[in-house]
Amino acid sequence: MRMLFVTGGRLIGLTLFLSSCLSPFHSSCGDDISRRPGTVTDDSPNSQDSSAAQRGWMHLRTKPYLPPDFDQTVFENLWQRWPAAQRGQAAAASSAERRRMTFSYYGLMAPPGDPDSNVPLGYVDTGDGHRVMNCLACHAGKVAGKVIPGLPNSHFALQSLTEDVRLTKLTLFKKLGHLDLASLKLPLGTTHGTTNSVVFGVVLGNLRDIDMNVDRSRPEPAQMHHDMDAPPFWNVKKKRSLYADGFAPKNHRVLMQFMLLPKNDRETLISWEDDFKDIQAWIESIEPPEYPFVINANLAEQGRVVFEANCSRCHGTYGLNGKYEQMLVPLAEVKTDPVRLQALNREHREWMRDGWMSRYGEDHVDVEPDGYVAPPLDGIWASAPYFHNGSVPTLWHVLHSADRPVVWKRTENGYDQQRVGLEVQEFNELPQSASSAHERRSYFDTRKSGKSAAGHTFPDALFESDKQALLEYLKTL
């Protein structure tokens, strides 16, 4: 995938690939940074079986692997739970406009090419009016107003949606579902666009023995609740393991961990293995989107030189001969928020290492990771906010650690071309006008546990001119 820029009467081709959260990126990447044995990947085209990838996409869009979350009647009545001002607007709106308002309010995406769909992209229609969540609820988002499957959904208001679904069901005398009940004890996410997904995996895994038999006798695990920013899917093909700390093997079984509700017994999970092999093929077939705005090619070329001298040791190189080798940067060096690393207990990691998820240890599981993976930066322009917890709204803020906002709020469809990332308002405190829980969740407060924007200060050593050139280059990746 290439984009051509005209500069000085010449055409310059810059290879464009695009990425994830800008975690550790260092001028020297000291000797203690871990390069564990694994596959070295390059920018050659992905050779996935296209038919498997197509099947994987259809599985996600059409197969209900979980119980329903709500039905169409509940969905059409959610607006009645909103604050008075929005409720009044919804009451006066047409049904089509009210549906669009509901999608916007909860950060739901319409399927690409079908903006009038009643079924959000992140849900499966069961055929009888019920909706079942799929992976795309968190892993299909929009940037600059465009919906992109595989992009993190930085709008998704899972906690607000679940609370309003529960209240609406009670009003309509409908049976509560698994998420309605679980969320009474387990927080789903304190900021729109992030979720408590790590703890979801711990809790669900704790209901199984290592062979995937349902086992409710296991003691309840320690739970360190915190929010995570979903990574972009298009970088999975470059990685040899999964998650911010790289502890889990990259295989189709690990992708099934959010399907571990007791309703899905061992035999059911095993029957889905081929489906999830296809889903993994689809994930690894995704290419990142190209930067849609103007790029200063001369400045970007200067930025490439800065990047390769200062950042490439951790984050790889890009272009025709680019290479990325996955690297774990110790927490003591990167100094980003530690809660994610602390939240996964050793017992959970050993459960994965010893059991079915890792093919009984055949696939490597790191039970003692001491830091975070420096991710590939393909599509970095699109995948804001940055860091594993989504605490930094733009790449400019990544490069200027002292200027990262304490509290920030994004606009719905705006894109900051100058700072490269989310268009945001910045605050020193949470505004008192944010009176409802839903409204408060639209603000990212970096003072909360697990939400710190500290760390990754390596770019502070660069001259400002180098930072501006680097910012321009990152648009081209």
Where are these regions (language model features)?
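Periplasmic c-type cytochrome electron-transfer domains
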Residues: 31-477
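Bacterial N-terminal signal peptides that target proteins for export
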Residues: 1-13
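Bacterial N-terminal signal peptides
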Residues: 10-24
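Signal peptide processing junction and immediate N-terminal pro/mature segment
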Residues: 21-35
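Mature extracytoplasmic/luminal segments of secretory-pathway proteins
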Residues: 2, 18, 26, 132-135, ...
